[in-house]
Every structure is written in structure tokens, then in C-alpha cells.
Amino acid sequence: MTSDDVSAIEVTDGVRSLHLEWDDPGIAVLGMIQLTRDELVERIRTGELPLPPLAKLLNIEVVDAAPGRMTLRLTPDERHVNFLGVVGGGVVGAVLDVAMWGAVQLSVQDKSMLTTVSMTSNLVRGVSHTQRALEAVAEAVHVGRTTATAESRLVDAAGKVYATATATFVRMGGGNG
């Protein structure tokens, strides 16, 4: 997915609108079940396997993916703003969560899927909707038979940290790793 996939925000009489389109999320689930880990990594990295609809809504795209790590790009805009006029902490948390999930999911050799059961995030500085793209860089810390953990950080192009997070994931069927 690229930022070209998301239509520009349109303004008519001061009202903003955004048209979104996404692929059937079942395609990605089916791909995860049918592909080897290496095939899954490659198809996510190239954009051949669609990200979930949440990625379109939040304007997230894959920068890089490999077993044990994932980097996503968030391009903030007005859709992300809270009542204080800055990008909401929930948006930041969601991007970090998706990146950490990718890092641990791409680490498993079997067909099990992982889901987040606990996440802690720390917002270090505010994110403006007018700033340039930020990257959520995540790494798997532990991938075991039943649980996995990961850590991530949201950084700008200069490496300045905006947020950090850690998460625990649990396996849901498919094997014992």
C-alpha cells in the first residue's frame, strides 16, 4: 500500500471528507494460512498482500518487514487530530501495535496467529498533524510456544523519538512454534 492509495482530504464549504477503499480483509487472513513465513514476509514487504482496513483508515504503509521486525510509516493529517489539536494517543498506540504485531507474527514458522493481549505505550512528545511522516519501528523481543513480546518506537526522519511501546501477544492455534 502506498500513500497514493488514499484519496486526498477534500474540503467543500469548510467541511472535510475522505473517501477510503480497501481490500477484503479475508484475503490477508487466507494468505497468512496458505503462505510460508518467507512468502508472507515478501508479500507484506512488497504490498502484494493487503494490510487490514485499519491501515487505510490510519494512513499507514509498510516501509520494511522481516522475521522479527517491521517498520510502518504513518503520515499524520487532520483525520488523526483529537480535541487538543494534536494526533491522538490512540492513533499513535494503534500504529505501534500494528508494527509490533507484524514483528512477532513474521517470526513464527507455523500457521499460528498472534493477537495482542497487553500493551503499554509512552507518549514522549506531541505529534502534529502537519509534520512529515513518522516511522513505527518494531522488533520482536521473545517469540515462544504460547506468547510473544515486542517493543517499538515512533520516530521522525532524524531519529527523534515521539513514543515507545511494549506488548505481549498470545498464539491462537496452528502449532506450537
Language-model features and meaning:
Residues 1-177:
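Terminal targeting signals and extreme-terminal segments of soluble enzymes
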